[in-house]
């Protein structure tokens, strides 16, 4: 009997020892799984909290920048000193101010200029375009000053006195047709110069560009005077009857 009891105890002891472990293992597994899931949930939730919210600049800073742009709307390009000054007023970095002005010149500035009656194309005209328009305006003003003379300008010319030949009604030779019809007329000014050198009483030579050539008329006058002098001399030499 004792041997049988010992045998039953030996047979039951392993089962009794193993049964609590088997009954406790599912609870431990569920607890570990819940802990792991909670940890993973925390890990997954961390990036959402660590992401920086995509917000805008403060309203006060934007107002300061817009006021500055309105004052300098015809040249909305702040210098480094002005950017530093705006950075101190708005508590923004220089890169934020530069980016804001880049976007504002494309989106805010055209509307701002149109509201105040200024076209953005005229306000932001480049240096080359302005120089080209200045040259066009100067070129347009030059012909107005040095244009062809009209009838009004011809009437305002000074009136020169007419030569003696025209006042007496004598027909003067045409200077344009004279060289082609009579080639010897070209040598007449030379004769006139010689006569003026030898005889001091002859009139001074007149350039052919200013007045027409009157050398033939002068020769006729000299010949008539000489003939009259000869006739008078002959009368004096004749004996009285």
Swiss-Prot record:
Segments of skewed composition (Polar residues): 21-39
DNA-binding region: 48-111
Keywords per UniProt: DNA-binding, Homeobox, Nucleus, Transcription, Transcription regulation
Region (Disordered), start-end ranges: 1-56, 115-213
Domain of life: Eukaryota
Coiled coil (UniProt feature): none
Location in the cell: Nucleus
Primary location class: nucleus
UniProt-listed GO biological process terms: regulation of DNA-templated transcription
GO molecular function: DNA binding
One Pfam family linked to the record: Homeobox_KN
TM region positions: none
GO cellular component terms, A-Z: nucleus
SMART domains xrefs: HOX
Record-linked InterPro entries: HD, Homeodomain-like_sf, KN_HD, TALE_homeobox
Keyword Nucleus: yes
PANTHER family (alphabetical): HOMEOBOX PROTEIN TRANSCRIPTION FACTORS
Family designation: Belongs to the TALE/TGIF homeobox family.
Role: May have a transcription role in testis.
Descriptive protein name: Homeobox protein TGIF2LX
């Amino acid at each position: 009997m004792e041997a049988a009891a010992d045998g039953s105890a030996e047979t039951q002891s392993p089962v009794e020892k193993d049964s609590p472990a088997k009954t406790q293992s599912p609870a431990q597994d569920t607890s570990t799984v819940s802990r792991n899931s909670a940890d993973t949930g925390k890990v997954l939730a961390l990036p959402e909290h660590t992401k920086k919210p995509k917000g805008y600049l403060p309203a006060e800073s934007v107002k300061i920048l817009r006021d500055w742009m309105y004052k300098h709307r015809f040249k909305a390009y702040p210098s480094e000193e002005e950017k530093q000054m705006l950075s101190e007023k708005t508590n923004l970095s220089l890169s934020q101010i530069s980016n804001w002005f880049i976007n504002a010149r494309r989106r805010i500035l055209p509307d701002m200029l149109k509201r105040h009656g200024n076209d953005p194309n005229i306000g932001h005209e480049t240096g080359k375009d302005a120089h080209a328009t200045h040259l066009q305006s100067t070129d347009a003003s030059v012909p107005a000053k040095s244009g062809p003379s009209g009838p009004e300008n011809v009437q305002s010319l000074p009136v020169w006195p007419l030569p003696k030949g025209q006042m007496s009604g004598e027909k003067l030779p045409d200077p344009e047709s004279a060289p082609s019809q009579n080639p010897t007329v070209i040598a007449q000014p030379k004769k006139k110069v010689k006569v003026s050198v030898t005889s001091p009483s002859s009139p001074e030579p007149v350039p052919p560009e200013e007045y027409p050539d009157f050398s033939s008329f002068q020769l006729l006058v000299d010949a008539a005077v000489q003939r009259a002098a000869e006739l008078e001399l002959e009368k004096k030499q004749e004996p009285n009857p």
